[in-house]
Swiss-Prot record:
Positions with a binding annotation for heme b 2: 86, 187
Binding site for heme b 1: 100, 202
Names of the cofactor(s): heme b; heme c
CDD domains: Cytochrome_b_N
Function as written in the Swiss-Prot or TrEMBL entry: Component of the cytochrome b6-f complex, which mediates electron transfer between photosystem II (PSII) and photosystem I (PSI), cyclic electron flow around PSI, and state transitions.
Gene Ontology molecular-function annotations: electron transporter, transferring electrons within cytochrome b6/f complex of photosystem II activity; metal ion binding; oxidoreductase activity
Record protein name field: Cytochrome b6
GO terms under cellular component: chloroplast thylakoid membrane
Designated gene of the protein: petB
Length: 215
């Protein structure tokens, strides 16, 4: 085993990477509230894992979506647990994100030179809310259907381009299969990809600039 490690160490300098990660200075004023961002990230990882598991059984059609969710809850082994964990971690992610934003704002973590870290954080908060909006519709029950109808109808109040935006969101004039397909694609591919990219940027900037000092 040692020879295998030495082979990789010679080529990748694993120990140097490990030392860099583990030797980062942590300011003495840091407390448990500075862990809120990490908890948000952990919730996102749980979301990805549990959501991926459900894609094996969920069917994104207006005729089968609700039945497939019922199948996950009643027939799939531990399906009820996976979906429940997905729902609980979603709530946890939103709550921890809100608390994280308050912590950063109250401790001045958005000030120079960390403005871009704050901007990426705001973008991540918008993406998180978008997860909630798109995911809420996927069971395609009465609550999900009317939530989508209301949310996608809001831009209709925008002058000139309102109706175009509504049609773009819904995929047609009315809410239907095209809407569900769009929301499913956003929820399972577009939003996770964008979130992963902005999280990486967020973490790299924190890594580069360090944790902000006390007020």
């Amino acid at each position: 085993m040692g020879k295998v490690y030495d082979w990789f160490e010679e080529r990748l300098e694993i120990q140097a990477i490990a030392d860099d990660i583990s030797s980062k200075y942590v300011p003495p004023h840091v407390n448990i509230f500075y862990c809120l961002g990490g908890i948000t990230f952990t919730s996102f990882v749980i979301q990805v894992a549990s959501g991926f598991a459900m894609t094996f059984y969920y069917r994104p059609t207006v005729t089968e979506a609700f039945a497939s969710v019922q199948y996950i809850m009643t027939e799939v082994n531990f399906g009820w647990l996976i979906r429940s964990v997905h729902r609980w971690s979603a709530s946890m992610m939103v709550l921890m994100m809100i608390l994280h934003i308050f912590r950063v704002y109250l401790t001045g973590g958005f000030k120079k030179p960390r403005e871009l870290t704050w901007v990426t954080g705001v973008i991540l908060s918008v993406l998180t809310v978008s997860f909630g909006v798109t995911g809420y519709s996927l069971p395609w029950d009465q609550v999900g259907y009317w939530a989508v109808k209301i949310v996608t109808g809001v831009p209709d109040a925008i002058p000139v381009i309102g109706s175009t935006v509504v049609e773009l969101l819904r995929g047609s004039v009315s809410v239907g299969q095209s809407t569900l397909t769009r929301f499913y694609s956003l929820h399972t591919f577009v939003l996770p990809l964008l979130t992963a990219v902005f999280m990486l940027m967020h973490f790299l900037m924190i890594r580069k600039q360090g944790i902000s000092g006390p007020l």
